[in-house]
């Protein structure tokens, strides 16, 4: 009877763990969408005074924010053009503006705690970010090269027709048999010079 109770206890514990009743960070949403961008939130304990928060995409460090207690909670960030951020009491939010499908990847946060001691470093929750492009964008990517190629073909065909018609028009006016003017035969100057040399 005892093994049965142990199995039930382990089963209930696993269910509570998977549903997030035991781990408080399981209900935390890491990604949220607003203003055409993605907000990636990384939570940390409220008691932390000095920290370094890094946002990773796979193994690449995208953003690194350092909060120090020195002169009025100074914040420094590496790569400020890419890393727009918002710092609150218990979270750092990084913003990805105008994401496209190439930025879909696994993102996670790494937290280094300096104060209160002891120094700790841990990886926080992560998640896979799927970014779907709209159907209109995909259709434009397909039809834009096709449309450009069709335009070039029509343009070339038009130029060839214009050249052909202009040559035909010019050629018909010169070789018109019903013209009142007759064509003159080309004069060969070599014959004259021979005759001039023979007579003298």
From Swiss-Prot:
Residue ranges occupied by any Ig-like V-type domain in the UniProt entry: 30-133
UniProt-listed Gene3D superfamilies: Immunoglobulins (2.60.40.10)
Outcome after substituting residue 181 to F: Selectively abrogates PI3K-dependent signaling pathways AKT and ERK without affecting calcium signaling
Pfam families xrefs: V-set_2
Membrane topology: Single-pass type I membrane protein
Record text on subunit structure and interactions: Homodimer; disulfide-linked. Interacts with ICOSLG. Interacts with PIK3R1. Interacts with TBK1; this interaction is critical for the maturation of T follicular regulatory cells.
Protein name: Inducible T-cell costimulator
Protein source organism: Mus musculus (Mouse)
This protein's encoding gene: Icos
């Amino acid at each position: 009877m005892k093994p049965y109770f142990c199995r039930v206890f382990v089963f209930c514990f696993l269910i509570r763990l998977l549903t997030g009743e035991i781990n408080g960070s399981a209900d935390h949403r890491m990604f949220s969408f607003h203003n055409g961008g993605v907000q990636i939130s990384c939570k940390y304990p409220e008691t932390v005074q000095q920290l370094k928060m890094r946002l990773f995409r796979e193994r690449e460090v995208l953003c690194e924010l350092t909060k120090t207690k020195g002169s009025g909670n100074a914040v420094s960030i590496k790569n400020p053009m890419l890393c727009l951020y918002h710092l609150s009491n218990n979270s750092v939010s990084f913003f990805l503006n105008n994401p496209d499908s190439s930025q879909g990847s696994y993102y996670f946060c790494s937290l280094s705690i300096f104060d209160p001691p002891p120094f700790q470093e841990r990886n926080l929750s992560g998640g896979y970010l799927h970014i779907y492009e709209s159907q209109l964008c995909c259709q434009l990517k397909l039809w834009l090269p096709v449309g450009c190629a069709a335009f070039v073909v029509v343009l070339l065909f038009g130029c060839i027709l214009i050249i052909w018609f202009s040559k035909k028009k010019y050629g018909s006016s010169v070789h018109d048999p019903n013209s009142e003017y007759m064509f003159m035969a080309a004069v060969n100057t070599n014959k004259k010079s021979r005759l001039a040399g023979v007579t003298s």
